[in-house]
């Protein structure tokens, strides 16, 4: 926030007690995230800032006897589109869970709609009672191994650095381009550095030596650590370690053992990708704090990682602490270990009281027009388009890892009839296909997947990272056709079929990524989708839609599928479904 001289004069007058504060919170214990101490003190607020701690009088007072005060929580890396909500609805859920600031990477909508998508996200995030900061997508398209809807170069993104809500460059996923000093990639990095921006990393599967390349290029954090050793490597390299606990990627338990008094201030919490049902039911950063404390992390350390550390990582100098001169974003808690939220304050105003959102603070925000965003375009399909022709029965198969975005590459015998793969629910060998949907080019990439344990039907979605083509997994070609046709009819969405009939769906008309519904209405439809998916045999211990949406992301190990076919992360190339060497 930019302050005028008059505002500074007013805050100084309140701090020096020459003027009363607009609001004083009394009798609470306040967490000092700088020292790690709790102290009973008044919190005086003026012009949306904390003017002072101590003994203060105000025009309005709130008695918080028996309560604790901590800074508003900050999510250091999230893709809003993965929640399937507009920024307006997203902010409502996040505020209820104490998250007053989020740093988002809109590369999902950018891969669909380019700069039109960026404009939508920036405008739709404006005038909300929550800070939504944006990092410019670095890799649109993510790779050359798939078709997406747009391309962004350094010139496209550099103009956005003038926007105060744009912090820097989002996760640099294309490591080969960095390592090979690709001109276009370096132009984006240099432009970001010249504008004083932060550069996020994406170091999935990288060795300790490879991290040197990222650091040399100015990349300063990473959220892809899935093991204790990877976490140590990043901290030793000088990176901020983003500890991710989202809907599919759950790395907290693996990384928590390496956190200690010496390195904790270089660690922050992120969720990356969260689906709506998970967000509504379990929360966001508040959920990570609860779980971390249950696993033995010191509560003060957990709150530092969820607030001050993240603010410092991104250069947000007025956020992350309950201290004089900081923006008055804070939570009043009934219990700090459970993150039991009594009230949420944003800019010194109570925006959530006992779980109820104050809707008046959303009056100034707009439901931003998304009709200019492109609609899906696919060629006319038939069931046989999903068949896989085979010359051998020994095949490369994608094996999902529940609650992870990585996969295993396994090789198994499959049933072949008349030269075509026959799906088997007994062997858990199902068809998966990716249908290009941006320009109607007709590309369909196909493969075999196991781990869904589906006994009948199909599930399909237009959320397919990062190019967001249509992806479908099913027990037969006919089931898959029914599901994809419905996704097309909805202009994008989530679909479950059973006996070739659509049994549940959620329309995502905003770029094929986001619902235009109220978050509670969308949530109810998601519950129905999950229920039918379980009826079809899919286990309930992981989210099949988010899992499916990451089977198309070739920059994550190990075996994936794009609209151009099966993709091997180790060789960074497409491979045949049949195993070429036995």
UniProtKB/Swiss-Prot annotation:
GO terms for molecular function: adenine deaminase activity. The keyword Glycoprotein does not apply. The keyword Manganese applies. It is an enzyme of class 3 (hydrolase). Its EC number is 3.5.4.2. Coiled coil: none annotated. SUPFAM superfamilies: Composite domain of metallo-dependent hydrolases, Metallo-dependent hydrolases. GO terms for biological process: adenine catabolic process. It comes from the Bacteria. Its cofactor is Mn(2+). Keywords: Hydrolase, Manganese. Pfam families: Adenine_deam_C, Amidohydro_1. It catalyses: adenine + H2O + H(+) = hypoxanthine + NH4(+). Belongs to the metallo-dependent hydrolases superfamily. Adenine deaminase family. PANTHER family: ADENINE DEAMINASE, N-ACETYLGLUCOSAMINE-6-PHOSPHATE DEACETYLASE. This is Adenine deaminase. The lineage of its organism: Bacteria, Bacillati, Bacillota, Bacilli, Bacillales.
């Amino acid at each position: 926030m930019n302050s005028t001289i008059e505002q500074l004069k007013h805050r100084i007058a309140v701090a020096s007690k020459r003027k009363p504060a607009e609001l004083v919170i009394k009798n609470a214990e306040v967490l000092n995230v700088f020292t790690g101490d709790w102290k009973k003190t008044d919190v005086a607020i003026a012009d949306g800032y904390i003017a002072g701690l101590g003994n203060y009088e105000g025009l309005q007072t709130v008695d918080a006897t028996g309560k604790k005060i901590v800074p508003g929580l900050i999510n250091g890396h999230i893709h809003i589109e993965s929640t399937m909500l507009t920024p307006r609805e997203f902010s409502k859920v996040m505020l209820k869970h104490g998250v007053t600031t989020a740093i988002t990477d809109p590369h999902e909508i950018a891969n669909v709609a380019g700069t039109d998508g960026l404009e939508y996200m920036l405008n739709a995030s404006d005038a909300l009672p929550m800070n939504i900061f944006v990092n410019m997508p670095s890799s649109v398209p993510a790779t050359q191994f798939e078709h997406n809807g747009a391309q962004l170069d350094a010139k496209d993104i550099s103009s956005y650095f003038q926007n105060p809500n744009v912090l820097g460059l989002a996760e640099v996923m294309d490591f080969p381009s960095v390592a090979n000093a690709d001109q276009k990639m370096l132009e984006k990095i240099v432009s970001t550095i010249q504008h004083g921006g932060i550069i996020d990393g994406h170091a999935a599967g990288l060795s300790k030596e490879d991290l040197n390349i990222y650091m040399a290029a100015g990349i300063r954090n990473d959220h892809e650590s899935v093991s204790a050793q990877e976490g140590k490597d990043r901290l030793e390299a000088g990176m901020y370690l983003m500890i991710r606990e989202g809907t599919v990627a759950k790395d907290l338990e693996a990384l928590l053992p390496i956190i200690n008094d010496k390195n904790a201030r270089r660690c922050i919490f992120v969720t990356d990708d969260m689906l709506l049902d998970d967000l509504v039911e379990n929360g966001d950063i508040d959920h990570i704090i609860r779980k971390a404390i249950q696993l033995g992390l010191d509560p003060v350390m957990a709150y530092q990682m969820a607030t001050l550390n993240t603010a410092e990582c991104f250069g947000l100098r007025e956020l992350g602490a309950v201290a004089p001169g900081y923006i008055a974003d804070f939570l009043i808690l009934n219990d700090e270990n459970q993150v039991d939220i009594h009230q949420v304050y944003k800019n010194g105003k109570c925006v959530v009281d006992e779980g109820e959102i104050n809707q008046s603070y959303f009056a100034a925000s707009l439901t931003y027009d998304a009709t200019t965003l492109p609609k899906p375009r696919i060629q006319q399909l038939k069931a046989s388009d999903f068949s896989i022709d085979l010359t051998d029965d020994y095949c490369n198969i994608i094996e999902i890892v529940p609650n992870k975005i990585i996969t295993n590459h396994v090789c198994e015998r499959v049933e072949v009839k008349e030269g075509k793969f026959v799906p088997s629910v007994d062997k858990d060998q199902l068809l998966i296909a990716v249908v290009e949907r941006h320009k109607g080019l007709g590309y369909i990439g196909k493969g075999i997947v196991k781990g869904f344990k589906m006994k009948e039907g199909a599930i399909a979605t237009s959320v397919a990272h990062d190019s967001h083509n249509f992806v479908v997994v099913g027990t037969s070609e006919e089931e898959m056709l029914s599901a994809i046709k419905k996704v097309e009819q909805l202009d994008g969405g989530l679909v479950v079929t059973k006996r070739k009939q659509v049994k549940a769906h959620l329309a995502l008309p905003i770029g094929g990524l986001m619902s235009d519904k109220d978050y509670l209405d969308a949530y109810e439809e998601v519950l129905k989708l999950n229920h039918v998916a379980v009826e079809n045999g899919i286990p309930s211990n992981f989210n099949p839609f988010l899992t499916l949406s990451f089977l198309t992301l070739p920059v994550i190990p190990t075996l994936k599928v794009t609209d151009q076919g099966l993709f091997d992360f180790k060789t960074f190339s497409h491979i045949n479904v049949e195993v070429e060497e036995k």
